[in-house]
């Protein structure tokens, strides 16, 4: 018997629109609202993580403002994923930003595209699967929406009510708005070529182009964070359901000194008449801190991950070790809150280099410099340290892990 060929699952590209300035949310040192912190992470990170863990998503492009390169790079430090995330600069309007994202995906092997506002972090896979099912069944354009429940009034310019508008067949549109890729790209290109740049969502462009738009049920939680109060409420929502899980790890290391031209401590080279002896660069401070970080999630110690018997680590920069440990912490759901290093040495003097060391720790760990501490003391000429035969380091790391549900 002749069998019909089975349908191929959709291969979805994701366009996340994050180029807006968000004036209604007020100014903040954290930047535009998509970079504000909720539940310990930037808004855009929550949005990205939802898509990165959704199987049909094969390509993700984030449309950002040209001024936000550093903000976006900092946000990405919260994410560990094999899913590639690419960026493209947006335009003056949302419509132009979306077109930039679509053009970036043009040469990718995708069948469909989901276009989503970065500041809608509370969608879920149930909604995404509902959209995918509609696309898989042949819909060219899919709009998640919820029926309007408020009573609607039409008023004149003076604020006088003219009439009550029937709510029947009225819906509030949400994102991700989803389409057959070539169909929406063509519609966007035609809208741009015609001089239209005033569309406020992508379903409107589909309607203008004569493409049927299918509604699927949205979710009440899938709200757009628009004003400052929205962001505060989102933070409360994410934080209230979690119990804090604060962990502290300790690390200790020591390396011998021998004749040389300097030592590397916390990634900073200090000229000296001795050097530290070791398989790698022998940065005793970073080695101790690596162990402290690994201890917070029970991930062994530095020797487990970088055996001194392995020739590939001979002479290696210890930055590799500390960044690896920080990555493991984040993979386990941890946020590094504080890193403290105490160096015990008779020489060289650490004080003149302390700020440079703190800056390096901040860079390696992806945390603010105020969360990085470096201290030093001598051993009062006692023992091997006192005899200038070695340098020791003690490190403490404080990490908050994603809590458990109450």
Swiss-Prot record:
4-CDP-2-C-methyl-D-erythritol 2-phosphate binds at residues 253-255, 279-280, 301-303, 377-380, 384, 387. It catalyses: 2-C-methyl-D-erythritol 4-phosphate + CTP + H(+) = 4-CDP-2-C-methyl-D-erythritol + diphosphate; 4-CDP-2-C-methyl-D-erythritol 2-phosphate = 2-C-methyl-D-erythritol 2,4-cyclic diphosphate + CMP. In the N-terminal section; belongs to the IspD/TarI cytidylyltransferase family. IspD subfamily. In the C-terminal section; belongs to the IspF family. HAMAP family: IspD, IspDF, IspF. Residues 247-406 are annotated as: 2-C-methyl-D-erythritol 2,4-cyclodiphosphate synthase. The record marks 24, 33, 279, 378 as: Transition state stabilizer. A divalent metal cation binds at residues 253, 255, 287. SUPFAM superfamilies: IpsF-like (SSF69765), Nucleotide-diphospho-sugar transferases (SSF53448). Disulfide bonds: none annotated. Bifunctional enzyme that catalyzes the formation of 4-diphosphocytidyl-2-C-methyl-D-erythritol from CTP and 2-C-methyl-D-erythritol 4-phosphate (MEP) (IspD), and catalyzes the conversion of 4-diphosphocytidyl-2-C-methyl-D-erythritol 2-phosphate (CDP-ME2P) to 2-C-methyl-D-erythritol 2,4-cyclodiphosphate (ME-CPP) with a corresponding release of cytidine 5-monophosphate (CMP) (IspF). Its EC number is 2.7.7.60, 4.6.1.12. The record marks 167, 224 as: Positions MEP for the nucleophilic attack. GO terms for molecular function: 2-C-methyl-D-erythritol 2,4-cyclodiphosphate synthase activity; 2-C-methyl-D-erythritol 4-phosphate cytidylyltransferase activity; metal ion binding. Keywords: Isoprene biosynthesis, Lyase, Metal-binding, Multifunctional enzyme, Nucleotidyltransferase, Transferase. It comes from the Bacteria. GO terms for biological process: isopentenyl diphosphate biosynthetic process, methylerythritol 4-phosphate pathway; terpenoid biosynthetic process. Pathway: Isoprenoid biosynthesis; isopentenyl diphosphate biosynthesis via DXP pathway; isopentenyl diphosphate from 1-deoxy-D-xylulose 5-phosphate: step 2/6; Isoprenoid biosynthesis; isopentenyl diphosphate biosynthesis via DXP pathway; isopentenyl diphosphate from 1-deoxy-D-xylulose 5-phosphate: step 4/6. Its cofactor is a divalent metal cation. This is Bifunctional enzyme IspD/IspF. Residues 1-246 are annotated as: 2-C-methyl-D-erythritol 4-phosphate cytidylyltransferase. It holds the Pfam family YgbB. NCBIfam families: ispD, ispF, PRK09382.1. The keyword Magnesium does not apply.
């Amino acid at each position: 018997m002749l069998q019909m060929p089975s349908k191929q699952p959709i291969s979805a590209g994701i366009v996340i629109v994050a180029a807006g300035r968000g004036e209604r949310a007020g100014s903040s040192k954290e930047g535009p609202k998509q970079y504000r912190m909720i539940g310990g992470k930037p808004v855009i990170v929550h949005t990205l993580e939802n898509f990165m863990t959704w199987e049909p998503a094969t390509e993700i492009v984030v449309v950002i403002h040209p001024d936000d390169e550093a903000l976006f790079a900092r946000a990405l430090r919260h994410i560990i994923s094999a899913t590639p995330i690419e960026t493209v600069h947006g335009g003056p309007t949302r419509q132009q930003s979306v077109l930039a994202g679509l053009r970036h995906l043009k040469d990718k092997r995708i069948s469909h595209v989901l276009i989503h506002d970065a500041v809608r972090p509370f969608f879920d896979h149930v909604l995404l699967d509902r959209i995918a099912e509609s696309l898989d069944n042949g819909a060219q354009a899919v709009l998640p929406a919820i029926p309007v429940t408020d009573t609607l009034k039409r008023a004149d310019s003076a604020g006088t009510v003219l009439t009550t508008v029937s709510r029947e067949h009225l819906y509030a549109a949400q994102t991700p708005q989803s389409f057959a890729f070539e169909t929406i790209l063509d519609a966007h290109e035609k809208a741009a070529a015609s001089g239209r740049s005033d569309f406020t969502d992508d379903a409107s462009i589909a309607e203008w182009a004569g493409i049927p738009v299918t509604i699927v049920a949205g979710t009440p939680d899938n709200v757009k964070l628009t004003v400052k109060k929205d962001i505060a409420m989102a933070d409360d929502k994410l934080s209230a359901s979690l119990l804090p899980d604060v962990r502290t790890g300790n690390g200790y290391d020591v390396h011998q000194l021998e004749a040389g031209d300097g030592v590397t401590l916390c990634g900073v080279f200090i000229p000296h008449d001795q050097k530290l002896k070791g398989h790698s660069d022998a940065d005793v401070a970073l080695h101790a801190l690596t162990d402290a970080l690994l201890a917070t999630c029970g991930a062994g110690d530095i020797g487990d991950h970088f055996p001194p018997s392995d020739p590939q680590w001979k002479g290696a920069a210890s930055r590799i070790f500390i960044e690896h440990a920080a990555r493991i912490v984040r993979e386990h759901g941890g946020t590094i809150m504080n890193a403290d290093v105490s160096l015990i040495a008779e020489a060289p003097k650490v004080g003149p280099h302390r700020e440079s060391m703190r800056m390096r720790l901040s860079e390696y760990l992806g945390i603010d410099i105020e969360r990085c501490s470096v201290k030093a003391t001598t051993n009062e000429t006692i023992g091997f340290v006192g005899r200038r035969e070695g340098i020791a380091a003690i490190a403490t790391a404080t990490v908050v892990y994603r809590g458990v549900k109450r």
